[in-house]
Each structure stands twice: as structure tokens, then as C-alpha cells.
Amino acid sequence: INAATMLGQGKNVHQAEIDAACELIDFLRFNVHFAEQIYREQPNNVRGLWNKMEYRPLEGFVLAVTPFNFTAIQGNLPTAPAIMGNTVLWKPASRSVYSAYFTYKVLEEAGLPDGVINMLPADDGAAVGTPALESEHFAGLHFTGSVGTFEHLWTQVSDNLDTYKTYPTIVGETGGKDFILAHETANPKQVATAITRASFEYQGQKCSAASRLYIPESLWPDVRGTLFAQLDDVSVGPPEDFTNYVNAVIDQRAFDKIVSYIEHAEEDDDAEIIHGGGYDDREGYFIEPTVIRAHDPKQKSMREEIFGPVTTVYVYPDDEWEETLQLVDETSPYALTGAVFARERTVIRQAQNALEHAAGNFYVNDKPTAAIVGQQPFGGARRSGTNDKAGSEMNLMRWVSPRAIKESWDAPEDYPYAWNQPDAEGELSLDDIANAEPAEAGDGAVNA
């Protein structure tokens, strides 16, 4: 799986190892653990009653549509619903079929029964998606990919609502325009290293990659010096050479899109390329780590997801910290990940409050990538998805349809309530009712 991820998706050996081996293993192990926690969650019982929750699979199948950039996510999207008892149709990205094949073979060798997860590779996603979403048995969508594709699938689901037996579950993680925001008290070497890693690991092809930076004027010279020195030391080339830090982007279409942002920055009066900017597609789709400086904080590359080794920095006046917090929150429609660097607790708390909805995964003095299963449940809101937190019990709960079961061992045999039962000399009076002892907790019924 590691080798297929390196060769098929263009990851260096380290990125492939922490993805295809480590994170995929974590997803499988932790999801079993989370499922056990869910099943343990049972209601209280009282004398004469047995209450229980049954966590049923959805009534139908789940369609898992997976991305090219993470083999672990590619494996998690079909297996998470399957662990909760669902049948899954799995449409892997056409650009990562190699690692998807080995992932499926591993599941088969581990004993996965036939028909539980059904991998359906296709160059044309509609060949799988359209008939699946038109089926009356469609019960859920587990998706990671672009905003456009997710919204298209959601529209198809909406158009077919009358077809389905039950309202389907929709879980999606889409794009990000993830930020690093530094305060004047931040450690400049930590900030620079976070940029190098979060912006350029796996060529910036992570939905969590840092692609907009906000650095104060007083800190910028030191950050720039360390950052440029690190980038000058970074090697670019194929993953077969283990010394290469940056490899090729995934395909020609991605290459052309990323290059268009570099070319736009070269022509835009509100931006300038201050490092890198080179590219070559003669043999592979290679792009140098590129840093753009934006003089307008809402310049094109500060707002739009690029999904490549290009990041944009806006250098703000030190005395405009609060205004910059507002810029970070309002500039992008996404809200996936973000990081704040500062060494004052009051500043950190201020940023956490001001950016409450700007990132579903918020990092303090650390890069905004590499969420760890079981430690940082992953997902964002706004245009970044439904925020159902992969790598947690919150995600697994979306793939069950709970049923509450009440079993009575002492059911009543007559219909009247206690207060209207006649006594030996006649019916109860209102005074008798008013003076009656209150019922104990647990004797009442929930109004439903």
C-alpha cells in the first residue's frame, strides 16, 4: 500500500508511511473502539422494565466517494459505515485506483465477506454515482472531495428524495483555505517551519494545507529569512528518490490550475512572487514551492483554494491585530483548519473566540495539518463540509439508525389511572387527590 501510494499518488516515503500505513491502521483500530463505546451507551432501567438502544445499520446501502490525496481517507470512508453494519458501494478516485486496489485486497485477506464493501472504479464518476443515487435503497453518502462535486451530489439526492425509503445520511468533507496567523509575540522559527511543512508537504495537496498566511510586520523579516532558507534546501523530484521533499502534483489538470494562480500573481499589481514560481511538465508535473506576497488581503490567492505548492502571505501592521482576526474569519468561505502562533495566553484566547467558526480544527502554536485519529477528530463547516469529525464516534453515529426498545415485565391489566379508582365507600374526592403522596422519580412517563 505504501509503494502504491508513492507511485500512484506522488507521495514521498514519509508522507506515504504516515498516511497509507499509520493513519489507515489508526482508523480501523479506533473505529472498532468507537463502535464499542457507542454500543455500550444504554439507557437506565427501572424495576419491571428493560430499556435498551439498538444501533441498527441504515436501511439501505451507503455510497462512499473517496479522494486521491489520502489512502487512509480512501480506506476509512467505506470501512467506517461497514463497521457499523452497512453495505457499501465504494467509488475510489480515478487517480488513486492503484492504492485503492491494494487496500481492498488487504480487507479481503483480513476476512471481509463478499458484498459488504463493493469497489467500483470508474473514470466517469457519474457511471457509479447516478444509478446509486437513483436507487430506492440509497441510504447514505460518505464523501471527501471538491465542493463542486459534493454540491452536485447533494442536489441529485434532493431531486430523488421521493424515491428513497428513508431520508439519507449525507456526510461530506470538502475543501479548505487554511490559515496560519502569527501574533507579534510568536516564535518566528516555529512560524516559518510550520509554513514549510503545512504549505508544501505533499505539494500542498491536502485539504488542511496552509495556503494563506498573516504575519505581523515586526516578525516578517525573521520569518521570511528562516522560511526562504528552508525552501532553498528543499529538493523537488520523483518519490523513488527518498531525498526529495516535494514531488509532482497529481495530474495535468491540477498542474494547469496551480500554474494559473502563479501566472495571475505575476500579472496582478496587488501581488508579487517572492520565492519560487518555477514549474515544468515535460516529465511529470513539477512545481517549485512558491510564496506569493499579497498587498491586498483579499487578493485572489488569499481567497481561493489552490490545492498545490503555493501559499500567499499578507504582512499586516502590528497594531491591526484585531482587524486581522476579522480578515481571517471573513476572507474565505471555508472553515476547515487554521493555526495561531502567539506566546501570550490572553492573545491566544482572544483568537480562539474571534475565530470560533473559522476552523473546525484549530491549532495553537502548531501547523494546521496532520490531525491524528483518536486525538484530533477531523472536519470543518461552512463550505468545508458537514463537520462530522472523521476519526471519532461522532462520525460512526451517522451510519446507524438507533432504535429504542422498552420491554415491560409487569404491564397493567386494566385501563383506569390510580387517581380515578373508587375506594370502598365510593370515588376519590379532589381533596384525596390533592393530598396524595407525590410519585417517585422513574414512575412517570415521557410525553411523546
Residue ranges and their predicted role:
Residues 28, 100-103, 132, 153-154, ...:
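Hydrophobic packing residues within well-ordered alpha-helices of enzyme cores
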Residues 146-173, 196-207, 217-246, 260-275, ...:
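Glycine/threonine-rich helix-loop capping motifs at alpha-helix boundaries
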Residues 1-39, 325, 330:
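Glycine-rich loop-to-alpha-helix module at the N-terminal edge of alpha/beta enzyme cores
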Residues 2-20, 175-177, 204-212, 228-260, ...:
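Flexible, acidic loop-helix segments that line cofactor/substrate-binding pockets
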Residues 112, 137-138, 181, 218, ...:
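Conserved C-terminal structural/oligomerization subdomain of aldehyde/semialdehyde dehydrogenase
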Residues 56-59, 283-288:
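A short, glycine/Asx- and small/polar-enriched loop/turn
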Residues 6, 25, 33-190, 387, ...:
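Rossmann-like NAD(P) dinucleotide-binding subdomain of oxidoreductase/dehydrogenase enzymes
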Residues 86-96, 116, 138-146, 165-183, ...:
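Short loop-to-beta-strand entry elements in the cores of soluble alpha/beta enzymes
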